[in-house]
Amino acid sequence: MNIFRLTGDLSHLAAIVILLLKIWKTRSCAGISGKSQLLFALVFTTRYLDLFTSFISLYNTSMKVIYLACSYATVYLIYLKFKATYDGNHDTFRVEFLVVPVGGLSFLVNHDFSPLEILWTFSIYLESVAILPQLFMISKTGEAETITTHYLFFLGLYRALYLVNWIWRFYFEGFFDLIAVVAGVVQTILYCDFFYLYITKVLKGKKLSLPA
């Protein structure tokens, strides 16, 4: 494992922990898109079905379990424990416009036409767009809490670091996964505008807002 994948994983984990702590400490999920969190839970569920069929390393298995547990915990907090604070009026992105095309694409473009491989491909495609309901929600409300922007920053940083990881692996290991790379590029592009606003506003103590 190279340093870029490790730091990418740590950034991803940091984003998840920040979100969970934000919800738990404030006893509120205001400003958080439950739909994005449902999509991420679906991403991890379909990606890590091989948890029961293959073992790569203790680190790999541990991270899979952590991602699954945290994603389910987040969904539980939003839709059950702190349901009264969930802003469903602004979380209105039509997720079927993401899930259906992604599902079709995973059947058409994959590495191998087997159930686990198709589901893995589905998870890669879906992860690249799963943040859209959250960004859409921010654009509707006009701004985001600082802690929410920190969550989004680390989530975007994780994907950017993984792009560097793939470049590293291509040059030093000869490994290249076109599906993962293209999906990662799409996901990183979605974060570009947010990164700019994060650096120019949030780091200077200002509120972040996305254009409606």
Curated annotation (Swiss-Prot):
Residues 25-32, 80-92, 136-149, 200-212 are cytoplasmic. Its main location: endoplasmic reticulum. The record marks 193 as: Important for recycling of cargo proteins with the sequence motif K-D-E-L from the Golgi to the endoplasmic reticulum. It is found in: Endoplasmic reticulum membrane; Golgi apparatus membrane; Cytoplasmic vesicle, COPI-coated vesicle membrane. Residues 204-207 are annotated as: Important for recycling of cargo proteins with the sequence motif K-D-E-L from the Golgi to the endoplasmic reticulum. GO terms for molecular function: ER retention sequence binding; KDEL sequence binding. GO terms for cellular component: cis-Golgi network; COPI-coated vesicle membrane; endoplasmic reticulum; endoplasmic reticulum membrane; Golgi membrane; membrane; transport vesicle. It holds the Pfam family ER_lumen_recept. Residues 47-48, 159-169 are annotated as: Interaction with the K-D-E-L motif on target proteins. It is linked to Osteogenesis imperfecta 21: An autosomal recessive form of osteogenesis imperfecta, a disorder of bone formation characterized by low bone mass, bone fragility and susceptibility to fractures after minimal trauma. Disease severity ranges from very mild forms without fractures to intrauterine fractures and perinatal lethality. Extraskeletal manifestations, which affect a variable number of patients, are dentinogenesis imperfecta, hearing loss, and blue sclerae. OI21 is a progressively deforming form characterized by multiple fractures appearing at birth or early childhood. Membrane receptor that binds the K-D-E-L sequence motif in the C-terminal part of endoplasmic reticulum resident proteins and maintains their localization in that compartment by participating to their vesicle-mediated recycling back from the Golgi. Binding is pH dependent, and is optimal at pH 5-5.4. This is ER lumen protein-retaining receptor 2. Keywords: Cytoplasmic vesicle, Disease variant, Endoplasmic reticulum, ER-Golgi transport, Golgi apparatus, Membrane, Osteogenesis imperfecta, Protein transport, Receptor, Transmembrane, Transmembrane helix, Transport. The lineage of its organism: Eukaryota, Metazoa, Chordata, Craniata, Vertebrata. The record marks 5, 54, 117 as: Interaction with the K-D-E-L motif on target proteins. PANTHER family: ER LUMEN PROTEIN RETAINING RECEPTOR (PTHR10585). GO terms for biological process: maintenance of protein localization in endoplasmic reticulum; protein retention in ER lumen; protein transport; retrograde vesicle-mediated transport, Golgi to endoplasmic reticulum. It is a multi-pass membrane protein. It comes from Homo sapiens. InterPro entries: ER_ret_rcpt. Binds the C-terminal sequence motif K-D-E-L in a hydrophilic cavity between the transmembrane domains. This triggers a conformation change that exposes a Lys-rich patch on the cytosolic surface of the protein. This patch mediates recycling from the Golgi to the endoplasmic reticulum, probably via COPI vesicles. Residues 1-4, 53-58, 111-116, 169-178 are lumenal.
